[in-house]
Amino acid sequence: NIACIPTKTLVHEAGIAALLYHDDYPKQANLYKQAIGRKNRLTSFLRNNNYERLSKRPNVTVYTGEGSFVSANIIKVALPEGDIELQGKEIFINTGSTPIIPAIDGIKESQKVYTSTTLLDLNVLPQHLIIVGGGYIGLEFASMYAEFGSKVTLLEGGNRFMPRNDQDIANSVKEV
């Protein structure tokens, strides 16, 4: 609940902000702050609702801990009360993904570098945002923040945007 649904919620809110207050940064920034608040409430609601619904099912046991593979079919889970081992023929990993931070000098020391996750926690709309990466996530964020009123610069290290997608589709998206 930190990526898809919250981002789509903000994309919708950005479209409204662009329609209502196009070229009025202070008003768009205020709508952005409100949208982040609504996104946070939605995320919290979904997380709590999903956890409650799952934990009440008789055939589901929820463990909150750190897991590691012992073998192909066994996972060790470190819990506050001690480690346990869980075994299964098939193991489904659903932890989300970790954003890639490129090897750029000074990037780790900067207090103004955000990932796709941490950017969504900002309560203040950036006046200018530089997005590194021209894949679908970078393009979605560029579009969203531009509609909220930020000046957006998009950088792609490869020879084209959306490098993992069909070139015809990528070219069509670039034209838009």
Q: Where are these predicted regions, by residue range?
A:
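Glycine-rich flavin
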Residues: N1-L125, G158-M162, D168-N171, E175-V176
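Rossmann-like NAD(P)H-binding beta-loop-alpha module
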Residues: N123-N165
